[in-house]
Amino acid sequence: MPISFPVDIQTLYVTGGKDKTIFYPQVTRMQNQTLENFINQSIVQETQALINQQVAEMPTTVAEMLGSFEIKNNQLNVLSLSLTNYTYHDKAAHGMTYIRSLTFDLVDGTHCSLEDLFKPGSNYIERLSDIIKAQIREREIQLINEFTAIHPNQDFYIADKALVIYFQLYDITPYVFGF
C-alpha cells in the first residue's frame, strides 16, 4: 500500500547565475486551494526574507548563495518545514547560514506560532527555557552569553511528534557549535 501524506511537495528553484541558486518547496494538489495558496505564499515570502537578510547584512558582493529546505513533518495534519539560506560574501572569513521554519495546522488552515502549540495562559516560555538550560548544562555547551530564556517567537519546528527549538548562529553559541 503506498504511503499517503497530507500534502504533496514539489521542488522549485530560482537562480541568479553561477553559484546562486535557491531551492524551495511548493505544496501541490491540496483540496483546499485557499490553504494551498496561503502555504505557498508564506514559503515564498519567508524565502525572500532570508535572501534579503543575507544581502542587507554585508556591504560586499555575494559570491555564493544556496537556499534549500527540509520537510520536518508531513503527517497528522501538520506540515512543518525549514528553509535554509547559506551565503558567502567576497572576502568574508566564512559564509553565514540562517534557518527559518514554518509550521501549518492543515485542519484549521493556520500558520502556527510557538505560542499556538500551548494552552492559553500556560507558562510555556519558562518551562521550555528550563529544559533548554538543563540541556546546555548536560551537554556542556559553551555559550557566548548566559542563556536566560527563549523568546515568545522563538524559532522552532515539529519533527515527527517532537518540538524542536533552535537558535540562529551566534544567538547563544559560537559559530563552531552550529544550530
Give the positions of each predicted feature.
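Compositionally biased intrinsically disordered regions enriched in Thr/Gly
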Residues: 1-179
